[in-house]
């Protein structure tokens, strides 16, 4: 992907930033823990790490593998909550984007938005 930059700000409402992201040559993911719930920062960190690991070990990246990566992360979060009851209710959003050939593929869960910046114009996908 060309010209990818990651930046996260805490904003004006929350005391803690629960955003996490990773950027590789052809894959990007952003997660945002559910603020106001216990473990939002843990969920977002866990999710982005699991998505990254899953996709980096997947031989073929396509729409199905992006969805599978999010489902895999969700399963890992659910399993962790089962082991640590204090984390009950934790959750996160996720947006995953991959460049495959000349196409951008994406998958998301939750209310995080995806935008494309092209020709000096920002458009929500």
Predicted region positions:
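PP2C/PPM-type serine/threonine phosphatase catalytic domain
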Residues: 1-125
